[in-house]
Amino acid sequence: GTCMRTSPSLSELQSRFSRSIVDGAADGLLPWISARGIEPSARRQIYRNAVLATQVETLATSFPAVQRLLGDACFDGWATRYAAWHGSNSGNLQHLGHDFAEFLETRPELATLRWLGDLCRLEWLRRRTILAADAQSLDVATLHASLLAAGDDPVIQLLPCVRSLASGFRVLDLWHFSQSPEAVAVDPDAGPQALLLWRDAGRVAMQECAPASIAFIRALSHGATLSKAVDAAMRIDAGAELAQLMVPLLDNALVRNVVPASFQLPASLHATREHP
């Protein structure tokens, strides 16, 4: 006998269509798309192209320095491949690009641009810094009193907007060069750069710091106690001293709170994608 094809429900069709737009696979969907003068595959591709274009535009907004240094055509090509490979299952594109650096680093064609991944990471950190929640920093007097009250080995909690990056390349110099390409060309292999980022008056501030200071700040961002954060710094520089390590945080008023170690949150709640 003849087998009747069972029509999928509306919700099933909607789910298939959504998956098709994200991953490009149209299995089980095309037979249920009415042609109406345009082939079903072409009709679906119109929607997919529109979604990809939106995602590429979002990536260009998130990674302007990468776009400038690669050139528009090259960037658009790789951003389109990333969007097609990665997709976004959400209408909220805020997190699109979180692994763009890793994607570019695995492309053999870009292997000679070894700095590209870290420049992506810097731009992603800039984005996360802007989007971070607001919080009030401690003034010097309150910070001093809080340190005394918190005991021997407190936890120093930083503002939510604080981010850090330790790179083997001159990524901050590259970023500045991308803003003013008429400046002297940058040698990305001239040495490592360790960077502190925060939000100041609604804009991203960036400062090059000693690698030990960034190790210290990164440990604090993960919820480490003060002594463990100093230990992390001393693994980079055996002569690191607490007073010097605190300078970037004090100069820029980046401390939100000081609590006894017994009050600290589990480390898993402090760890973020930006602080590996």
State where each predicted segment sits.
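N-terminal, charged low-complexity regulatory/assembly segments
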Residues: 4-135
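Short loop/turn hinge sites at secondary-structure boundaries
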Residues: 23-24, 181, 223
